[in-house]
Design a protein with these regions (language model features):
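C-terminal accessory domains and tails appended to enzymatic cores
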Residues: 1-132
Length: 132
């Protein structure tokens, strides 16, 4: 009975997370950049919307903020828009110099994810990437 109770609780949290992502999308002033206050499971939900290009959310392990590319569809590894080529593989000061964002921390070589130390920094990077 305890196992069943735990599974029901997990399902409730999962549906609450889905609702939180839908709410963030609905309330986003810019539908191309969706900011989540927690690291929710967002990929299948936002890939089914037309507008989102990037999602900004906290990294629950490091405290950094993540800028993640939204995929063309939930089963694809193809992003709608990649982060700028000039950011690829850059870290710390090298990334700060190219972005102008003081707390920029990292951009993956494949340009599908980047990080900053603040939500504001991550959103600024997402806006720059959108215009690139």
């Amino acid at each position: 009975q305890m196992v069943l109770k735990k599974e029901i609780e997990k399902a409730q949290y999962f549906f609450e997370d889905i609702e939180s992502v839908k709410k963030a999308y609905k309330e986003a002033p810019d539908k191309q950049i969706i900011v989540l206050e927690h690291s929710y499971p967002w990929k299948s939900i936002l890939s089914n919307q037309k507008e989102p290009m990037f999602v900004v959310h906290p990294d629950q392990n490091t405290g950094e903020w993540v800028i993640a590319c939204v995929r063309k569809n939930p089963r694809s590894h193809e992003n709608r828009k990649f982060l700028p080529a000039s950011w690829a593989g850059k870290k710390k000061q090298a990334l700060v110099e190219v972005t102008g964002v003081p707390d920029a921390e990292f951009c993956h070589n494949k340009r599908f994810i980047a990080k900053a130390w603040s939500k504001e920094g991550a959103v600024a990077m997402a806006r720059l990437a959108l215009r690139a």
